[in-house]
Amino acid sequence: TGGAGFIGSHLVEKLVKQGHKVKTIVPYNINNSWGWIDTLSQSIKDNIEIISGDICDQSFVLKESKKIDIIFHLAALISIPYSYKSPKSYITTNVVGSLNMLEAAKENNVELFVQTSTSEVYGSAQFIPITEKHPLNAQSPYAATKIASDQLAMSYYNSFNVPVLVLRPFNTYGPRQSLRAAIPTIISQIVQNKKK
């Protein structure tokens, strides 16, 4: 899931280049856009099965996850500021959507479920370097939904033996990234200061 996004589009591209069969769920939209997948070369796009749909639709994800070896779950609402304005939409997409994907992984006996989380689950650092032992401390509705999703993933491992890997990336950056993210903002500020 999340193949249309910043990290997801890079993952999709890399998996195709490595010769894997790739299927991704992208949100339906009236523009018929596949997000960042639209910018990939045609030879890459020709090797991706793209399904438009909603991870909040349990029967849809259950059906589309059949005969899948690994689920890379990256789909999420990610804007921290917007999470304060619409926390329920974050719970629906980030928590219920993750639950649906975990249930699909369980029912379809996937070999591995990769839950993509965020460093935001740690809040302000209580010690550095931050390790997995750092306390979880949601400082936004977004972070709270990611903690809930991570804990659901671990519960599916503990309760149902669904093989789970939780990734918590810190400040990813690169091509296709939103200019509002931390690293592009810092770079933009440096460039602006040099022009003064």
What are these regions (language model features)?
Residues 47, 138, 189-195:
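Juxtamembrane helix-loop transition sites at the ends of transmembrane segments
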Residues 1-172:
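N-terminal Rossmann-like NAD(P)+-binding domain of SDR-like oxidoreductases, especially those catalyzing
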Residues 103, 154, 184, 188-192:
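Generic alpha-helical structural context detector
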Residues 147, 172-186, 193-196:
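Glycine/proline-rich active-site loop of Rossmann-fold NAD(P)-dependent oxidoreductases
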